[in-house]
């Protein structure tokens, strides 16, 4: 099947989806309706571009016909030639765009995410850097019009982040932030360093797609739920009613503790949202580990401990080791202006996949 047959098949399926989503039987089936809605949303951009491409092809044909029929009208012929030139340039652009749009899509790209950041090697300095990363992602989310909600956080004595869990919601969140999972290294002079020596510390980032209950169901008998009293700074009990929730997925040992909310039910709901994402991610990672060939065509190895980026403060430099990108814009990037880095990662990933398809 050539690219044009593929595009026509996508358009035909898109029109079929529109009809299915109006079917009362589909509307009443929540799971199927969500699946079909997601499929329609995932193909909309491709169909729109394909329809625009077909219009460009028509414009080329019309311009060529106009040149033939100009009958010595120099002004009309010149106008038609200009239209032909512009349309041919647009045709090439659309063909490249459509090749990328036809690449196999990550089914999670349109999903919200659970973002986890932890201070790793480097003690207090690592925790402080984890806080810097949290601020960077919060500010980037603002630029994208996303909602950023801290669900659980643990702060150390110097105000750094031991661990933070956040929900980021909005359009195409996972597609842009999925490349952030891995070890982020910082090189700078800590505020406590009297000799002015540069120290190296690390924080880890984990990005997981949000998983809806209808997509991944956890058997309640696989969960152990403990209820306890929330505690504040210094460990004092801050609530007379037991509202904090500890949830353990017994088969995997994955554990979530939640005490941010004032009610047990809200803490339970948030804990469930996180544990569902972690368990689904756990099994997805196992499946991905078994597909070495596919992993080679993506950015990085997929290893969660892989060092993906270095932030060098003395040189105001950010280096993404996976794609060899170096930018002297550390202050800009940490202020939330991450587009240049993320766009480069997306483009690299798409290029690798196109090359793999053409082999």
Curated annotation (Swiss-Prot):
Keyword Metal-binding: no
Pfam hit, one: PCRF
Tagged with keyword Cytoplasm: yes
Keyword vocabulary terms for this entry: Cytoplasm, Methylation, Protein biosynthesis
UniProt-recorded Gene Ontology molecular function terms: translation release factor activity, codon specific
Family annotation (InterPro entries): PCRF (IPR005139), Pep_chain_release_fac_I (IPR000352), Pep_chain_release_fac_I_sf (IPR045853), Prokaryotic/Mito_RF (IPR050057), RF-1 (IPR004373)
Localization: Cytoplasm
Stored PROSITE patterns: RF_PROK_I
Residues recorded as bearing N5-methylglutamine in the entry: 236
HAMAP family per the UniProt record, alphabetical: Rel_fac_1
Family in the record: Belongs to the prokaryotic/mitochondrial release factor family.
Task performed by this protein: Peptide chain release factor 1 directs the termination of translation in response to the peptide chain termination codons UAG and UAA.
Protein name: Peptide chain release factor 1
Record organism: Streptococcus agalactiae serotype Ia (strain ATCC 27591 / A909 / CDC SS700)
Gene: prfA
């Amino acid at each position: 099947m050539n690219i044009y047959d593929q595009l026509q098949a996508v358009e035909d399926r898109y029109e079929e989806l529109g009809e299915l989503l109006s079917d009362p039987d589909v509307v009443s089936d929540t799971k199927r309706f969500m699946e079909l809605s997601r499929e329609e949303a995932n193909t909309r951009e491709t169909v729109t571009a394909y329809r625009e491409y077909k219009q460009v092809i028509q414009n080329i044909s019309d311009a060529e016909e106009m040149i033939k029929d100009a009958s010595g009208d120099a002004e009309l012929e010149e106008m038609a030639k200009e239209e032909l030139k512009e349309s041919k340039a647009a045709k090439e652009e659309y063909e490249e765009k459509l090749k990328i749009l036809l690449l196999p899509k990550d089914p999670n790209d349109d999903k919200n995410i659970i973002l986890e950041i932890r201070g790793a090697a480097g003690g207090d300095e690592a925790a402080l850097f984890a806080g810097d990363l949290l601020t960077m992602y919060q500010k980037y989310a603002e630029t994208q019009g996303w909602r950023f909600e801290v669900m659980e956080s643990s702060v150390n004595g110097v105000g750094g982040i031991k661990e933070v869990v956040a929900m980021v919601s909005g359009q195409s969140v996972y597609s842009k932030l999925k490349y952030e999972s891995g070890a982020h290294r910082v090189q700078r002079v800590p505020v406590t360093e009297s000799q002015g020596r540069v120290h190296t510390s690390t924080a880890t980032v984990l990005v997981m797609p949000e998983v809806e209950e209808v997509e991944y169901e956890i058997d309640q008998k696989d969960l152990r739920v403990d209820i306890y009293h929330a505690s504040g700074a210094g460990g004092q009990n801050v609530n007379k009613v037991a509202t904090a929730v500890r949830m353990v997925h017994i088969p995997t040992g994955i554990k979530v503790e939640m005490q941010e909310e004032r009610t047990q039910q809200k803490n339970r709901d948030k804990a469930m949202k996180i544990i569902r994402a972690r368990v689904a991610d756990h099994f997805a990672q196992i499946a991905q580990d078994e597909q070495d060939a596919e992993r080679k065509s993506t950015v990085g190895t997929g290893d969660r401990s892989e060092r993906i980026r270095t932030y060098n403060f003395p040189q105001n430099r950010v280096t993404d080791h996976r794609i060899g990108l170096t930018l002297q814009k550390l202050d800009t990037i940490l202020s939330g202006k991450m587009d240049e880095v993320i766009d480069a990662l997306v483009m690299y990933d798409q290029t690798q996949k196109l090359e793999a398809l053409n082999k």
